[in-house]
Amino acid sequence: MLENICINFKKVKEKTPLVHSITNYVTINDCANMLLAYGASPAMVESFDESYDFAKLASCIYINLGTLTREQEQSILMVCISAKNNNIPVVLDPVACGAVPHKIALIEKLFEIGRIDIIKGNIGEIKSLAGYNAKTRGVDSIDNGNDSIDACISLAKKYKCIVAATGVKDIVTDGKRTALIENGSKMLTLITGAGCMVGALTAATAGVEDDKFIATITSILSMNIAAEHTEKEVIGPGSFKVKLIDNIYLLKENHLRKEGKIKWI
């Protein structure tokens, strides 16, 4: 399984997947730079008039609900319809869905009329979508309960998609296979946009890999190992954020192969 992850990582470098992103305004530049550093090609296209047609060109689509506007919402609907019609995978980051019921209604509609292949959120967001009690503070989760794995598996089965929940240990599941990723750095919680950047990387790996379970593990493991490298080189969150992009750029297959800490459940 780890070898498949390394192959997926290498394919991003070889194929330069085009990631069509409709993301939030807080981290849009971070996501674009992270994609470039990883070997992908970012396109931050959110205009309603362009969204359906541009989505046809993408290797994968990344949707982030962090600063949702009315035009973004309409564009997201069109992008998901285009993805369904043109067989383009979609990664969804349901930012703050636990705090904003309208976002949950939108997500239900996206599954109804469009396509979502991967949901990547923090554990609070995932538990909210799965119908579990969740502890959130705005866009942040303060929940790492014992039922986290059950919630992820339940949501994956409900929507027949990959679910990834980030936390102290990151959970990835397709409802049958489940992985716990134990790499990471506490410094990721001290910068804005770490989760958004992981979502963008997930779209890059999913754009070149048929097995979206593997693709999701690849992206999260990449970010976490790069974060471990970065933590050793910096003195605080400001330098950490800048150096993190450098270490994503410098990441090699052997780092994943030798340093990856994954438990298969």
Curated annotation (Swiss-Prot):
Its GO biological process terms? thiamine biosynthetic process; thiamine diphosphate biosynthetic process
Q: Gene3D superfamilies annotated for this entry?
A: 3.40.1190.20
Domain of life assignment:
Bacteria
GO molecular function ontology, one term from the record: ATP binding
The UniProt record gives the binding positions of ATP as K120, T166
The record's EC number reads: 2.7.1.50
By its UniProt entry, which InterPro entries does this protein fall under?
A: Hyethyz_kinase, Ribokinase-like
Cross-referenced HAMAP family: Thz_kinase (MF_00228)
The family database entries (NCBIfam families) matched by this protein are listed as: PRK09355.1, thiM
As for what it does, the entry says: Catalyzes the phosphorylation of the hydroxyl group of 4-methyl-5-beta-hydroxyethylthiazole (THZ).
Q: What is this protein called?
A: Hydroxyethylthiazole kinase
Record organism = Clostridium novyi (strain NT)
